[in-house]
Amino acid sequence: MLEPLNTLLAAPNPHFVNRAEAGGDIIPLSHITFPPASAIAVAALEDALQGSDTVLPALYRESDGLQLFANRADSDECFFLLPLAHMAAEKAALYEWLLTDDENCEDGDAVYGVPIWWDSAVVFAGFGQAPERFYLATAGAHRGKVFYFNHEECSMRIADSVAGFLDLLCADPVTFMQRFYDVAYWDIATYHPA
């Protein structure tokens, strides 16, 4: 379940290489783990998830948040899994962004404004220096699905599960970053773990 992520974390010298036409620069990266979340905090997460996911609790039993693909020259350029203690504040901040949409509706994979199941959603990941966030629906028709909030458009369902989300992230980090991160890594062409 966490094997692709653990493989990523074990990379001895992770780096991106920019496209040749952009100079071919190497961007040294780091993947940062933290001490495990407390049993009480993980139990609270499990309660919030309402049985919609088992991957996040397993992950937080190993590390209370993660920083992945962090630029060694500027660690704020990164993808992160939030520490459990920050999830409520990030959800409140994302709610303010969702309120800026003029409509509240769902259209296939797209969600505009505040979804009807928002109260039970869990905001768990995002990018440094950007308002983009990832959240999990824990109730309703999208229960267990992962959504990506893009502050210039709407929220989009991008994975049918947290495991599927981690597969997207770990299997092709370049495509993941270029698809979802609007602040940095525009010119990357390849990812190398060593």
Where are these regions (language model features)?
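A surface-exposed partner-binding patch
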Residues: 1-129, 181, 192-194
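Beta-sheet entry/capping signal
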Residues: 121, 133, 145-146
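Acidic surface patches and DE-rich sequence motifs
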Residues: 127, 139, 150
